[in-house]
Amino acid sequence: MFNLRDSEKLFIPFITAGDPLPDISVELAISLQNAGASALEIGVPYTDPLADGPVIQRASKRALENGMNIVKAIELGGKMKKNGVHIPIILFTYYNPVLQLEKEYFFALLRENDIDGLLVPDLPLEESALLQMTCKKENIAYISLVAPTSEDRLKIITEQACGFVYCVSSLGVTGVRSEFDPSVYSFIRKVKEFSSVPVAVGFGISNRKQVDGMNEISDGVVVGSALVKKIEELKTKLVNPGTRADALLEFEEYAKTFGRLYSVK
């Protein structure tokens, strides 16, 4: 099971599998690794993404139109590993796509494609025991989400945590935010007190100032919507073989602003 404890401040990016195209997702993963990513979340596109804001919803729509599904997303993770991605890969999926597969087949796919972690944002703690137990048996980190509303269950969640704890910075859906409620900072400190694994903060991280602020009180950040939005902006250049290399380099340089390779020029 992967361990991020010895890393510097964590930079955990999120991309939607198959957006804008599956092969380009592999190249984006390599760019993110080059940009200093500690681990990578790949999101399974879903028709009813309750936790996702408009940016990731649009990415899911594009990926679904390209035929992406949970099986292909897992296989895409395996392709990333075969093409030189050595950082941990975490599958981010809603529970319904998992239910569509036989449990044995699902975990065989994860194992065969060298997937390191699993994050299911809409599965309540009380219903996750079987999935957590199977993940432990398969040496896959089951990533726990904690939100300000789950404070009363904080001790239980952090005791069961593997890999890292994903601390939700704000209530509502994912998306870029200009500022956070002041109460979130005391909540993150409380999560740190309870957790024996690193605590990474996500939902709304969109600039270096926010990264620096969260790094002061946590072990790092998860960045999703800002990166997915950049992919959307670069889509035309990414799908064009003649401009792809330049677009990937631009994406990589942008991603560096969130991680340990950031430098003021």
UniProtKB/Swiss-Prot annotation:
Role according to the record: The alpha subunit is responsible for the aldol cleavage of indoleglycerol phosphate to indole and glyceraldehyde 3-phosphate.
Q: Which leading EC class covers this enzyme?
A: lyase
Identify its protein family.
Answer: Belongs to the TrpA family.
What is this enzyme's catalytic activity, as reactions?
Answer: (1S,2R)-1-C-(indol-3-yl)glycerol 3-phosphate + L-serine = D-glyceraldehyde 3-phosphate + L-tryptophan + H2O
What's this protein's name? Tryptophan synthase alpha chain
**Superkingdom, according to UniProt?**
Bacteria
InterPro entries cross-referenced by the UniProt entry: Aldolase_TIM (IPR013785), RibuloseP-bd_barrel (IPR011060), Trp_synthase_alpha_AS (IPR018204), Trp_synthase_suA (IPR002028)
Which E.C. number(s) belong to this protein?
4.2.1.20
Spell out the Gene3D superfamilies in the cross-references.
Aldolase class I
Which pathway, metabolic or otherwise, does it act in? Amino-acid biosynthesis; L-tryptophan biosynthesis; L-tryptophan from chorismate: step 5/5
For this protein, the record's CDD domains field holds: Tryptophan_synthase_alpha (cd04724)
Question: Is Transferase found in the keyword set?
Answer: no
What is known about its subunit structure? Tetramer of two alpha and two beta chains.
State a single Gene Ontology molecular function.
tryptophan synthase activity
State the species of origin. Answer: Bacillus velezensis (strain DSM 23117 / BGSC 10A6 / LMG 26770 / FZB42) (Bacillus amyloliquefaciens subsp. plantarum)
Q: In the UniProt entry, which residues are flagged as the active site?
A: E41, D52
**Which cellular component appears as one GO term in the record?**
cytosol
Query: Which keywords fit this entry according to its UniProt record?
Result: Amino-acid biosynthesis, Aromatic amino acid biosynthesis, Lyase, Tryptophan biosynthesis
Q: Name one Pfam family in it.
A: Trp_syntA
Q: Which NCBIfam families match?
A: trpA
